[in-house]
């Protein structure tokens, strides 16, 4: 299972939000490029970069920082935030990003998802950011009436390469991922799932590992890495290709 550090960029800085609230952003680095290089140096197999300003404005803002990250780290980089046109997607992919993640477009413009999948193939993923089981859009500021698993099925039919699932109410809380919803999602579709939101301990990573046979491909970790609650090297040893075990903790069971 991939352990993927998150790099969220707001006003040019590396920040973490709390439950998607921009007003509660905490800065963990003034230079996102330096932060990215550090995670790559520590062995991150992939980086998850989000342009929070772009998500709010509807078009990518921090493309220079993104390009600098892509050129300076050896691992693949995936990017999301404000990708609501084929031109924006193309511009980001042209900068060397391995995979782009479209969120709002999945709800408001599925035709764009189809076009991107036809044109760019496996480099297109969607982000399903949920609040109470309903998909949120426009930088998490609005909640739609679309249910997560229903939309996931539609996106699978369009040919997306992966689905990034974020439980917004778990995001930044360090209280553990929403395992119940993740299990529902992995059971609903066959496309690889990447979990995001709530990881606060190494045990949380192992809980998620129990879902790998069901289709969980990776986990994005943000605040816990920056606070030191989760050590990247330990997480990689626990759940990466050379992991300690293939069994979850004793108190974890899935039907």
Curated annotation (Swiss-Prot):
Transmembrane segments: none annotated. Coiled coil: none annotated. It is found in: Cytoplasm. Its EC number is 5.3.1.16. One of its GO terms (molecular function) is 1-(5-phosphoribosyl)-5-[(5-phosphoribosylamino)methylideneamino]imidazole-4-carboxamide isomerase activity. It is an enzyme of class 5 (isomerase). The active site is at 8 (proton acceptor), 129 (proton donor). It comes from the Bacteria. It catalyses: 1-(5-phospho-beta-D-ribosyl)-5-[(5-phospho-beta-D-ribosylamino)methylideneamino]imidazole-4-carboxamide = 5-[(5-phospho-1-deoxy-D-ribulos-1-ylimino)methylamino]-1-(5-phospho-beta-D-ribosyl)imidazole-4-carboxamide. Pathway: Amino-acid biosynthesis; L-histidine biosynthesis; L-histidine from 5-phospho-alpha-D-ribose 1-diphosphate: step 4/9. NCBIfam families: 1-(5-phosphoribosyl)-5-[(5-phosphoribosylamino)methylideneamino]imidazole-4-carboxamide isomerase, PRK13585.1. Belongs to the HisA/HisF family. This is 1-(5-phosphoribosyl)-5-[(5-phosphoribosylamino)methylideneamino] imidazole-4-carboxamide isomerase. It comes from Gloeobacter violaceus (strain ATCC 29082 / PCC 7421). The lineage of its organism: Bacteria, Bacillati, Cyanobacteriota, Cyanophyceae, Gloeobacterales. The gene is hisA.
